[in-house]
């Protein structure tokens, strides 16, 4: 083993010890969390009546709970669905089959038992698939809780938010990025969010982050070899300038990769929060009708009276897998005697400034009012900026083909080819599909995603660590152009970046506060 390889192995030992502490029981009957209390909770939504509810139990006493609930001394079959009666433990003898006539039946349930370490948490896990009535669920949860008896070593408690996922992490079943992917998968509302969450859950981000960390450690090893073995006259470390050059080149390449990744994250965040789509136009051009057509619902009040919509109306819709926050706004006109309407107009302009994409709705039935000057002035203002705009000619069913041609010509003459122009009819639905297709293309461009490529979405925690720890450490490494004069400081900056990645995946030492923050955002039962 050469000096650099030796140093690399020494540098990763800290990470190795952490991983070993997490996974040392992964192949044995006893998981790392063996001595922790057995936990239980409802894994399906609470306070909702449903056909089925799933109660999850995880820990050393899962088999004991099974025996007491079904009044049996047999070992539950592993990974096999069985149908059993569930009884109140207080009505059963500790010795099974005694006093059968006094047993209180709670429900008939489908049971699944997973033996450690081959379960989600890495512990013994028992799942009760019971009927979904609130009374049924509450009675069984109460029955499980009644089995807690610390004096006899039966430490059984109700799970806290994220407890099951925390056990899975502690037993080396998943890293933090995968578990955050599970949470995002549960919370996903659209196809693009689902694809991104599934990518994290499958470990794509984990592999990427681990490769980054390995690159940093390899280059730290090169620098540390110079520090520790400079007096050994080793042939491998004599050409220090070449080593410095290679390390600098490698770290520049890595930094560029992370910056590109962060840019994709920033673009993809729009998918998580929802793309803000605002409809602008003069009064009575059909903005509300278009909102109702796109949402397939009567979100906005439709009337022939100008100024009907006086305030902004937001609605969440799913457009071809994209989460969209669509906003209907008050019609914009220069003068109005109605103070409330003027407030609505002001709010409409502010909403458009905050939007990701604007639909400028025009009415083709009156060429003289086709392009109101006040709206054009707003769209070309510095405040509005260079936002994307699509011109939508509504009410196409009210004009002839020749009249529509005149309208399109006037729009192109005044606006040029800067904005795409589409015609639709909310009455006949003509052009709506074409509009949706154009919107989808813009959404793909805004988020740098497509039907074939998953967007890159990470938690705020991961994003902040990448920025404040990883990139910060790398930038500090470059601050001194002549960094080889202080190799120790340069190496420590790389270590700072490496430790940042370890925080992301959960391999860092002393990360209890990080774990508390991550799992507190999970639901109970997960």
UniProtKB/Swiss-Prot annotation:
PROSITE patterns: G_TRME
GO molecular function: GTP binding; GTPase activity
Entry's Gene Ontology BP terms: mitochondrial tRNA wobble uridine modification; tRNA methylation; tRNA wobble uridine modification
Protein localization: Mitochondrion
Transit peptide residue numbers: 1-19
TrmE-type G domain location: 274-444
Pfam family, one: TrmE_N
Superkingdom of origin: Eukaryota
GO CC aspect terms: cytoplasm; cytosol; mitochondrial inner membrane; mitochondrion
Binding-site list for GTP: 281-288, 328-332, 394-397
Alphabetical keyword list: GTP-binding, Mitochondrion, Nucleotide-binding, Transit peptide, tRNA processing
Anything else known: Present with 768 molecules/cell in log phase SD medium.
Subunit note: Forms a heterodimer with MTO1.
HAMAP family xrefs: GTPase_MnmE (MF_00379)
Chain's role: GTPase involved in the 5-carboxymethylaminomethyl modification (mnm(5)s(2)U34) of the wobble uridine base in mitochondrial tRNAs. Involved in the expression of cytochrome c oxidase subunit 1 (COX1). Works in association with the small subunit of mitoribosomes.
Family: Belongs to the TRAFAC class TrmE-Era-EngA-EngB-Septin-like GTPase superfamily. TrmE GTPase family.
Entry protein name: tRNA modification GTPase MSS1, mitochondrial
Gene coding for it: MSS1
């Amino acid at each position: 083993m050469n000096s650099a390889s030796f140093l690399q192995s020494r540098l990763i030992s800290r990470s190795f010890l952490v991983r070993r502490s997490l996974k040392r029981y992964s192949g044995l009957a006893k998981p790392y969390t063996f001595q922790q209390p057995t936990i239980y909770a409802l894994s399906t939504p609470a306070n909702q009546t449903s056909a089925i509810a799933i109660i999850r139990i995880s820990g050393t006493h899962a088999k004991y709970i099974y025996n007491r609930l079904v009044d049996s001394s047999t070992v539950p079959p592993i990974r096999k669905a069985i149908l059993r009666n569930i009884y109140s433990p207080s009505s059963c003898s500790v010795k099974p089959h005694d006093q059968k006539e006094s047993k209180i039946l709670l429900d008939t349930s489908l049971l699944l038992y997973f033996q450690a370490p081959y379960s989600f948490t890495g512990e013994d896990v028992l799942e009760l698939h019971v009927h979904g009535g609130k009374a049924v669920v509450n009675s069984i949860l109460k029955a499980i809780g009644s089995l807690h008896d610390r004096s006899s070593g039966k430490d059984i408690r109700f799970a806290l938010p994220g407890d099951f996922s925390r056990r899975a992490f502690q037993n080396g079943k998943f890293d933090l990025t995968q578990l955050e992917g599970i949470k995002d998968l549960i919370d996903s509302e659209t196809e693009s969010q689902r694809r991104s969450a599934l990518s994290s859950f499958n470990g794509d981000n984990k592999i990427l982050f681990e490769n980054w960390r390995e690159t940093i450690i390899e280059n730290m090893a090169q620098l540390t070899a110079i520090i520790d073995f400079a007096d050994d006259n080793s042939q491998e470390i004599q050409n220090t300038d070449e080593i410095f050059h290679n390390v600098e080149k490698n770290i520049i390449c890595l930094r560029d990769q992370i910056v590109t990744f962060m840019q994709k994250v920033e673009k993809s965040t729009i998918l998580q929060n929802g793309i803000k789509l605002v409809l602008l136009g003069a009064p009575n051009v059909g903005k509300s009708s278009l909102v109702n057509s796109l949402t397939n619902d009567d979100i906005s009040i439709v009337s022939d009276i100008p100024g009907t919509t006086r305030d902004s109306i937001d609605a969440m819709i799913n457009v071809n897998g994209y989460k969209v926050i669509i906003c209907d706004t008050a019609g914009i006109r220069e003068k109005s005697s109605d103070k409330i309407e003027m407030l609505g107009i002001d709010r409409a302009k502010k909403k458009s400034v905050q939007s990701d994409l604007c639909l400028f709705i025009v009415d083709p039935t009156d060429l003289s009012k086709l392009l109101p000057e006040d709206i054009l002035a707003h769209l070309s203002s510095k405040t509005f900026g260079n936002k994307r705009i699509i011109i939508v000619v509504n009410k196409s069913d009210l004009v002839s083909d020749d009249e529509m041609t005149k309208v399109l010509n006037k729009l192109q003459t005044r606006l040029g080819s800067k904005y795409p122009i589409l015609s639709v009819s909310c009455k006949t639905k003509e052009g709506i599909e074409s509009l949706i297709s154009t919107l989808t293309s813009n959404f793909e461009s805004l988020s740098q995603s497509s039907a074939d490529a998953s967007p890159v979405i990470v938690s705020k925690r991961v994003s902040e660590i990448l920025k404040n720890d990883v990139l910060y450490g790398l930038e500090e490494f470059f601050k001194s152009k002549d960094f080889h004069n202080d190799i120790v400081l340069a190496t420590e900056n790389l270590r700072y970046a490496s430790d940042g990645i370890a925080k992301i995946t959960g391999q860092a030492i002393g990360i209890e506060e990080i774990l508390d923050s991550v799992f507190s955002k999970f639901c109970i039962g997960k």
